[in-house]
Amino acid sequence: MHASVRVPRHVGIIMDGNGRWAKGRNRPHSFGHRAGVRAIKRVMYGCEDLGIEVLSVYAFSTENWTRPRTEVRALMRLFHETLEREFDEIHSRGIRIVVSGRRGELSPRMRERIDDAERKTAQNPNGTLNVCLNYGGRAELVDAVRSLIESGVSAAEIDEKALAARLYQPQLPDVDLIIRTAGESRMSNFMLWRATYAEIFITDTLWPDFDVPDLERAISDYQGRVRRFGGRPEPAEPLELSS
């Protein structure tokens, strides 16, 4: 990776492969999810060291409720335990915690823990961990539109800026780089608004095995791309040959 070249401000990760990782070791899915939490911690601190401002991790989607009830319960318990266990260290390193998603379907205990973590870390200056929990890109847009309607905004006043201001975490910048693990090549309803012009990096590495060197490879690939944002770079001026 070229340290002197730009790094993305906002990296989003679709963490895939926990179940396959556990199955390959003849262990239950919960074993893979716990290993996946350790990977989040490694990558979060790697982003901090590299100067990446925001890391968004796709922890639980609005569609994940259709998984077996025992797995959903185990995941929710793991989220709460992880926030309890890791909070002090994350806070001491100056990392801000925010959560994107529909909170109404989470337990009161979980909502209280999230609110507490967001409040206590709100002024932390060393980057942001955005946990996408009960999150869906379509749900985020639906909720943003509902918020606009409820606020009494007229149709003539609705534009991209107005809609963006109603997203779950409107202060966050657009996603520059999306990393998807386990070789899958779908967006899976992740960050549909913010990732409009994100670069995408796909790796066969299963999420529990993903580490800082994998992150650095993804960023190195990102650094080699030309980001056009729908436009086209100006052609180089023709050389004037002396007669």
Whereabouts are the PLM-identified features?
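Flexible, compositionally biased loop and terminal segments
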Residues: 1-243
